[in-house]
Amino acid sequence: MFQEMIRQIQRAETISYTGKIENIVGMSIEASGGRAAVGDICQIYNGDAGGQVMAEVVGFKNDHILLMPYSDMSGISAGNFVRNTGRRLSLRMGPFLKGRVINALGQPIDGKGPFQGGTLFRVENNHYINPMTRPPIRERMEFGVKAIDSMLTIGKGQRIGIFAGSGVGKSTLMGMIAKNVKADINVIALVGERGREVLEFMEKDLGPEGMRRSILVVATSDQPAMLRKQCPSVATGIAEFFRDQGYDVLLMMDSLTRFAMAQREIGLAVGEPPVSRGYTPSIYAELPKLLERSGNFQKGSITGVYTVLVEGDDTNEPIADTVRGILDGHIVLSRRLANSNHFPAIDIGASISRLMADIVSDEHKRLAARVRDVMGIYEKNADLVSVGAYKAGTNPRLDYALGKMDGINQFLTQGVDEAFSYEEDLEAMRKLL
């Protein structure tokens, strides 16, 4: 108790720096006077309404401080006072977060009451992690999804991307993973989601079983860009807290594209030049800083699953291309497979786990290679077969593939309420071939 009092005294504000608003353009607020550093939290006092708006320092322009608000700016006007709190965004961490839903400021929004106690944890996306402190990834993380565990095996501490257009089963796959994965705890960030989809994801995709060992961090599409930008950092900070307690954490983020869009809004508002498709240079600095926070560590691990929305199913658009180069593999969801009622709609040929060869047995590698070989032969000749131009017996390898494809497709499909162990997957692959 005495030590806590000392910490409170050390954190107490002894000097208060104030300024006033000079200009507002779009979502950017310019203030003069006072002192501040990038990342400081400021309070804007709305004199007429008697309220306060929290904002973060995002840059400087001449002698003015540039601020971006965490809430609606309605009622703010030139001349309003701005006070620098001298603090950074922090939230309380503890076991009480399990099964809860919070916003991007760490405040509970599920109606289950406020948090009590816990450890105050600063949320920042500027941690440098010494690469020499990262042990090699040698253990599997079982996802309970056949197509992933058998053909795209993922290790504890690996970072994988799910690349998908809209409406191909991305949220459903995330729910399946959250329910079936052999992780100690799930941390799920929903960035820029439609408001109605949050509860729908909890009840339909995640379910009570998945929710019990999950923590949801939510910033909906109608909230300010600062909240949508902070949401992934808050979720990653929570994952880091539990990792330091020795947990193997699954961190899921939906989606990195909306995080990049929020950063684009902020960058354009403070005067950054647009580069590729309107994205600003800061995005390409923020993405690796965020993604490198996941991984395998001495005490625990953070296995990252990040979704990327591909515009017009173009997997080579700027954000998708950048993220693919940072992550340790990618899972591509195919609209063609989804349209043929093949779920999860994972395109095995277009997907890869870069660490699979290091974490599975030689037998598993041989079986997976044979399945890929059969699928590749079939795909290469699919048009020939579909128009009836192929004559059986002409190509023995194609004949073999045609005889196996129905079984392979059946093996790679899975119901949302089904779960399979790694051993069951291996046995099924042996029988397939």
Residue ranges and their predicted role:
Residues S150-M151, G157-L433:
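P-loop NTPase catalytic core
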Residues N23, G33, N46, G59, ...:
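Flexible glycine-/small-residue-rich
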Residues M1-I109:
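N-terminal accessory targeting/assembly segments
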Residues N80-V82, L89, F96, I109-Q158, ...:
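P-loop NTPase nucleotide-binding/switch module
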Residues E4, N84-G86, A104, T119, ...:
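Residue-level signal for pocket-adjacent positions within structured domains
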Residues R7, G51-M54, L89-M93, P108-P114, ...:
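Active-site phosphate-binding and catalytic loops of NTP-dependent enzymes
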